[in-house]
């Protein structure tokens, strides 16, 4: 029996996936600037022609990798709110998610390189800014949902809380990137969990004490 012949669209999709995989590996191992188009196509088993028939440049490919990473993060966050449970349980899961992401976000170095590149490339800056803005809107919407469902008043606007929380997470990730030994430091987890807990539970502390970070980890591991 002859193997099924792939359509042009399917072959193109397969080529893009292999280029994505090779680029992601190379960028994380060598860094974006030190990785050439030749490195990527050699790793994927293609030619430069295959690369440029799918992407305009390395920056274009990097932006697409960041888009995928952002989409995965949003899907993970949505899944938290699809689980059954009280608003307090959803809040605990959200806190645990960010504590976990701080330790396990493998693609964070790509975001750091993208932010630096965006300072010198206005077109690329627009793409990276759009991705981060979308992330902030997504987190803000979930914070608003949590506080609405639990009948708690927001201490700040949801978008301000999202900006503060995401910025704190990115700052802690940057410290972990520069000092890898600190990535597993329990203090880092406590800082993230307690900050989020003090904000998201602020209005209901008298009714229900904020969940401690160890309890958040229990929820995370379920």
Give the ranges of each region predicted by the language model:
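Secondary-structure edge/capping motif, primarily at the C-terminal ends of alpha-helices
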Residues: 84, 115-119, 176-180
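Hydrophobic/aromatic-rich alpha-helical bundle segments in the mid-to-C-terminal region
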Residues: 124-126, 147-222
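Amphipathic alpha-helical packing segments from all-alpha helical-bundle domains
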Residues: 79, 104-112, 122-148, 160, ...
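Generic hydrophobic, amphipathic alpha-helix propensity
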Residues: 12-23, 40, 65-69, 73, ...
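Solvent-exposed, amphipathic alpha-helical segments
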Residues: 18, 22-29, 76-80, 110, ...
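Short loop-to-helix capping motifs
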Residues: 57, 120-122
